Amino acid sequence: MMSNGGDSSEIVRELEELKLKKAEIEHRISTLEAKLQDTAAVELYDAVSNGDSYLTAPELEHGLSPDQIYRYSRQLLLPSFAVEGQSNLLKSSVLVIGAGGLGSPALLYLAACGVGQLGIIDHDVVELNNMHRQIIHTEAFIGHPKVKSAAAACRSINSTIKVDEYVEALRTSNALEILSQYDIIVDATDNPPSRYMISDCCVLLGKPLVSGAALGMEGQLTVYNHNGGPCYRCLFPTPPPTSACQRCSDSGVLGVVPGVIGCLQALETIKLASLVGEPLSERMLLFDALSARMRIVKIRGRSSQCTVCGDNSSFNKQTFKDFDYEDFTQFPLFAGPLNLLPAESRISSKEFKEILQKKEQHVLLDVRPSHHYKIVSLPDSLNIPLANLETRLNELTSALKEKGNGHANTESCTNPSVFVVCRRGNDSQRAVQYLRESGFDSAKDIIGGLEAWAANVNPNFPTY
């Protein structure tokens, strides 16, 4: 035992001596490397002082630095792009409106390829359900402004470009001032009022607009207001019906679809900025993810009768500032709760919880689409999608009769009650309006829908 102890002590002592020698050797290596660098610097200085200019960085007519030549070398090697394209790109400025599914890939590629000045505007914060498609963000930025997250990502890719941050919503009150600072505008938003507003502003400022859209399994892309081409209003003088306008958060999107369109938005922007290639003006690219098919269609040219860019248009900057785009499109700029019903036609999620606890007779009608209902639902609920409610009222009547032991009356349906739920409390209000008009006087909306249930009653209830 003693000899083993002695052996251990000897090993420890020898190990410490070796560690000390290692530290001394590493210190000596660092010292010699520093001296070598100093010697090389002195030799270079002496050579330059003696007129040996071949050792200095050459003065290049195109103005690109050695670092820029190396960073962008793979682009410089392209005959169709070359030095001229890169120089134009470095002098350009681009504003990307929206740092979401479309803006994420567009921003990353624009930063990487060397756009000189890159602006990012978005009022929203990063959420977990952004991760599958908004690839510029990471989980570390959840709860933080998207602009801050996107700007950090762009700077981490290319620290040599200027990145401007606008943590605010784009409105008529600030759009002219912000957009006027950039050469090219990229619309990466997802709602009609923003599209009209951005296009109108670009017309007033004479800016080309790279516009993309992605929803579900489809996407599209075009360039407006370029070389005499049309603006958004030329194609859509009248807003589409609100039933045809949906956001990704409502209808869903496969993450890679906005990724494809966002990359193509970056490409069109690079073509505009570098003066290389043929931008998608007066043409529209359509992408179908399910068939992996892309096609380009001809779209109508600029309309001389357009109320904004037409020959006799009286639309000006003051008109723009005073214009109500939400009223024009009948669509909100930002997704939020509707308020369609009087207070007596609504109950809170906590009040509905009390009804369940008291075991009061009722029918819980879930008016979400059936594929939403399959994701998650409250127990003992009846699923009739809002779009089918009119043709399937008999199912609700049957459910009421069953709950009321055959005493429910289809004329009044006062007992038991009908409580209507949806995802966020908007479609349920529309359903209650229709039900009350149809004689179901006891119908009430559950305020805030399933999201409110998860927030106020059951934190373990999944949201999506």
UniProtKB/Swiss-Prot annotation:
It catalyses: [molybdopterin-synthase sulfur-carrier protein]-C-terminal Gly-Gly + ATP + H(+) = [molybdopterin-synthase sulfur-carrier protein]-C-terminal Gly-Gly-AMP + diphosphate; [molybdopterin-synthase sulfur-carrier protein]-C-terminal Gly-Gly-AMP + S-sulfanyl-L-cysteinyl-[cysteine desulfurase] + AH2 = [molybdopterin-synthase sulfur-carrier protein]-C-terminal-Gly-aminoethanethioate + L-cysteinyl-[cysteine desulfurase] + A + AMP + 2 H(+). Pathway: tRNA modification; 5-methoxycarbonylmethyl-2-thiouridine-tRNA biosynthesis; Cofactor biosynthesis; molybdopterin biosynthesis. One of its GO terms (biological process) is Mo-molybdopterin cofactor biosynthetic process. It is found in: Cytoplasm. One of its GO terms (cellular component) is cytosol. ATP binds at G101, D122, N129, N130, M131, H132, R133, K146, D190, N191. GO terms for molecular function: ATP binding; metal ion binding; molybdenum cofactor sulfurtransferase activity; molybdopterin-synthase adenylyltransferase activity; molybdopterin-synthase sulfurtransferase activity; ubiquitin-like modifier activating enzyme activity. PANTHER family: ADENYLYLTRANSFERASE AND SULFURTRANSFERASE MOCS3, UBIQUITIN-ACTIVATING ENZYME E1. Plays a central role in 2-thiolation of mcm(5)S(2)U at tRNA wobble positions of cytosolic tRNA(Lys), tRNA(Glu) and tRNA(Gln). Also essential during biosynthesis of the molybdenum cofactor. Acts by mediating the C-terminal thiocarboxylation of sulfur carriers URM1 and MOCS2A. Its N-terminus first activates URM1 and MOCS2A as acyl-adenylates (-COAMP), then the persulfide sulfur on the catalytic cysteine is transferred to URM1 and MOCS2A to form thiocarboxylation (-COSH) of their C-terminus. In the N-terminal section; belongs to the HesA/MoeB/ThiF family. UBA4 subfamily. This is Adenylyltransferase and sulfurtransferase MOCS3. The gene is MOCS3.
